Amino acid sequence: MTTHHRVRSSSNSSSNNINNNNNNNNNNNIHQLSSSRTMIDHHNSDPTSSSSPTNESQIHHFSNSNYNYNYDDVDDSTINSNSTNNNNKNRNIQNNNNQNISNNRDNNNNNINSNLNNQTNLINYNDDEDYDEDYEREIEDDEEYEEIGDEESSSGIGGDSEFNDSLNGSKAGSRNREIWINPNIELMLKIALSTTKNPYYYHNIAKKLEEMVGRPISEKLVRSQMTNLLGKNSKFFKHPYREIKSKPGIPKSLINSHNLREKQIWESCKNLITEIKSSPNYYSIGGGSFPTNNNNHNNASGASSSTSTPSTSSASSPASSSSSLSSLSNNNNNNNNNNNNNNNSNSINNSNNAHSIYPNGSNSGNSKNSSSSSSSSSSNNGNCSSNYPSPPLSENHLSLSLPSISKSHSNNTGSFGFSLSSPTTSSSNNSSNNNNNNNNSNQFFSSISDQQPSKKLHVVSPPLQSLQSIQPPISQLNNNNNNHHNNHHQNHHHQNHNHQHHSKKRKIRSYDSKHLEKFQVIREKVIETLSEIDDIINSMKNDSDNDNSEFEDC
């Protein structure tokens, strides 16, 4: 009976060990399972041994008839019951282990699939926007030019797997690798050429490319590819593509067709890159800043330069492309003023001393339609009007109605009645100056009208006789003041215009009223000085008359 007790206690202790180990560590259950099934065997005397054989070998061990067991003093029913209990427990433990293993396998598969999806969504080709421009560092990378949207091959041509494998093998061993042209890169460039420039430029390209290739394309990848292709130090032209030489096992016709196709794709991509750089939609790819209203602004400039935004991949002529480039560059430099017109009356500091810095209505008909100016001036009967692109009309000072200035050419009379809303108020001040034949005498007052749109100037003109008697000094004074004022306004306008291109909202700082007050004080001083000079002249005339009378008396 001692043996019977030993077997029962051994089986119980082994089952307890199994239950404890099942709660602590599932991986050790298999080993404990093996030890529990060998406890009846006299060859294994240690019930806690963890170095027992596996389940498969242990099952084979029990099925082997060569082993002899000494169970003479052991109750058969006890052995059967213990083995049945152990088998049930072992079966439950094995089921739990299998379930845990399958769950872990499913989790691992899910993690692997998610990682693969992330890797395919963000294809690792220069994903870092601040990538190093050094080509030697780029050579060390595993892939020079990763596929966009094509999972079949990394050679960029698709098709025969054997051919692609041989190409990949040859590419991996080359140090002076050249870029493999990807047909999807050509597709991306075509989409980029037809995509309108706006803050969602890369996003729109990525979405269109995603629809074309049928798989997710990240916006970051498109940005890095476009930066590499259109960047200042683009390696696309330095290392365009590699011609495949004869290789064993590859038909020569297939190699020739590959080389021909690669060359054709590269030529197409090169033309597309040139066209993108010369199109109105092109901007500095590496900058990353987008003016908010740049789209409509450049559409207006493009319309004036006979170059339309291309909607397909067909290339425009170099002449039209260069004209659109000059249109874009000159629009920023000329500040929407007709400074490049042949007629000097429309420039800022013109020889005719026009009434304001805006295009003069009398001579604006002679101004030519230049692609360098996005604001075209047109007027009739002396009224000045300018047409500007749509974005600034509602947000900056260009939307304000310009002062209406009437000018008669028959008697060369300058009238300086100004108004912000209607030209009718100019007639109220014209009556006092109809006999004034000098245009320069009114420029000083008319130049003030452009600065304070919310106020009207009620000019009190000096005596007409005094104005006519001292025209040369006043003309010099007004010329100096007008030139100084125009230069100041030009600089002020230039600064504000540059600020508008780099800000989200087109706002302009309101003109300080102190300037207007200064002009008013100067005007009053001038009028006072004129009256004093007029008095002196009158007194001199009186003295001369008296002298003449005395001479006549003699």
UniProtKB/Swiss-Prot annotation:
Question: Cellular component per GO?
Answer: core mediator complex
Q: Where is the composition biased (Basic residues)?
A: 485-508
Q: Where is the composition biased (Acidic residues)?
A: 139-153
Region annotated Disordered, chain positions: 1-127, 139-173, 293-395, 416-509
- List where Polar residues composition bias occurs: 164-173
From the UniProt record, list the coiled-coil ranges.
none
- Spans of biased composition, class Low complexity? 9-30, 46-55, 63-125, 293-387, 416-449, 461-484
Name of this chain's protein: Uncharacterized protein DDB_G0281497
